[in-house]
Swiss-Prot record:
InterPro entries: NusB-like_sf (IPR035926), NusB_fam (IPR011605), NusB_RsmB_TIM44 (IPR006027)
Alphabetical GO biological process terms: DNA-templated transcription termination; transcription antitermination
Superkingdom of the source species: Bacteria
Name this polypeptide is given: Transcription antitermination protein NusB
Organism: Variovorax paradoxus (strain S110)
GO molecular function, one term: RNA binding
Keyword Lipid biosynthesis attributed: no
Function: Involved in transcription antitermination. Required for transcription of ribosomal RNA (rRNA) genes. Binds specifically to the boxA antiterminator sequence of the ribosomal RNA (rrn) operons.
Length: 181
């Protein structure tokens, strides 16, 4: 039926289609809607995965990652901090994460391990990024790149570390009702 036939038959016209910007059909953000820092986290995750799985040299990983399509849209300074800071501080990051794990590191997916490194590193060193943003970004990374329920594990670990690493900020959010106690 054409629009004229719909009117003649007494049918209601279809409502105008809503414009959805920045989302895919599944509701995930399109690449174009991601911030430069979100992109930096994605590239850092890919690079950290190469480090954890292949034990590749950080300099080689860095050069390889910078040549990937879309890297020019990422915040290169944030990527550098996440990649090199996580690799250099791996032992300290693991020491903070380990008490919250219910299994050995060897049993954790390298994706979830790398996402937790990113989260803990940002909690400690990127104080300009609110803790809830760090947590949400890491959950989104785990959803996009990790296993089926990996994001829940990442959420539990990072949510457990947030009060320890960002005590004043978490407490202020809890007092204002922005975060659960």
């Amino acid at each position: 039926m054409t629009e004229d036939n719909n009117k003649a038959a007494g049918a209601k016209p279809r409502p105008a289609r809503q414009v959805r910007t920045g989302l895919t059909s599944t509701g995930a953000r399109k690449a174009s809607a991601k911030s430069n820092r979100s992109r930096a986290r994605e590239f850092a995750l890919q690079a950290l995965y190469q480090h954890l799985v292949g034990r590749n040299d950080p300099t080689e990983i860095d050069h390889f990652t910078r040549d990937l399509a879309g890297f020019h849209k990422a915040d290169a300074a944030h990527y550098d901090a996440l990649l090199h800071g996580s690799i250099e501080g791996a032992e300290q990051l693991d020491a903070l994460i380990r008490p919250l794990l219910d299994r050995k590191f060897e049993e954790i997916s390298p994706i979830e391990h790398a996402v937790m490194w990113i989260g803990v590193y940002e909690f400690q060193h990127c104080l300009d990024v609110p803790w809830r943003v760090v947590l949400n970004e890491c959950i989104e990374l785990a959803k996009e790149f990790g296993g089926t329920d990996g994001h829940k594990y990442v959420n539990a670990v990072l949510n457990g570390l947030a009060p320890q690493l960002r005590a004043a900020e978490v407490e202020a959010d809890r007092a204002s009702g922005k975060a659960r106690a």
